[in-house]
Design a protein with these regions (language model features):
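N-terminal membrane-targeting hydrophobic helices
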Residues: 1-192
Length: 192
């Protein structure tokens, strides 16, 4: 069961959510946008609760199984947008963009996990294909869950590794994209 607890940390999945939200936010977004961004990015790891109910790591609903799939990500994205961002005044294309945003955030979890160096792989194509995948390059060290284990030397090494391979790229990409958007807006003829 211990290997089932090896994932990029919940903190790093949250950093990706905040970085993505910073780029995609249209002006000042409501608190629910930021909370849902983080929830969508970490939700797939709720599958670890299955261990308490006898669901094994490699099972369909086991850790890194269906709940880490792209199909599940789309379901979550559409449900999040439908439950929290649908109103009579919302334009359909804007609603679909919000659904896509939350779907991509949820999918980012399984994709990041596929870059880790441990476990059984990620069932990215579930429920259509039960194969569990890793990417050929796995620079992200697996992370312990639980405060005690996370505060160990191993946990500190994982944080340093995630700073390099997740936080730095996510924050850098957000800053570069946001700066590019601001510069493009400043240079557009309608602003002069």
């Amino acid at each position: 069961m211990a290997e089932g607890w090896l994932v990029p940390s919940i903190i790093s999945h949250s950093v990706v959510a905040v970085a993505a939200g910073t780029v995609c936010a249209d002006g000042t977004m409501p608190v629910r946008f930021w909370l849902l961004s983080i929830i969508c990015a970490v939700l797939p790891d709720a599958d670890v609760l299955g261990f308490r109910f006898g669901i094994n790591y490699g099972d369909f609903f086991g850790h890194r199984g269906f709940f880490h799939s792209l199909f599940f990500a789309v379901l979550v994205g559409v449900l999040a947008a439908g439950m929290f961002f649908r109103s009579p005044t919302t334009r359909p294309w804007r609603w679909w963009l919000v659904a896509l945003y939350f779907s991509l955030l949820t999918a980012s979890h399984g994709i990041l996990d596929a870059f880790t160096s441990g476990g059984l792989g990620i069932a990215l194509l579930s429920p259509f294909d039960a194969t569990r995948y890793f990417f050929p390059w796995t620079p992200i060290r697996v992370s312990p869950l639980g405060i005690r284990a996370f505060m160990s030397p191993w946990g500190m090494q994982v944080i340093m590794n995630e700073l390099l391979w997740i936080w730095l790229p996510a924050v850098s990409a957000a800053v570069l994209v946001k700066a590019s958007l601001v510069l493009a807006k400043m240079g557009s003829p309608e602003e002069h």
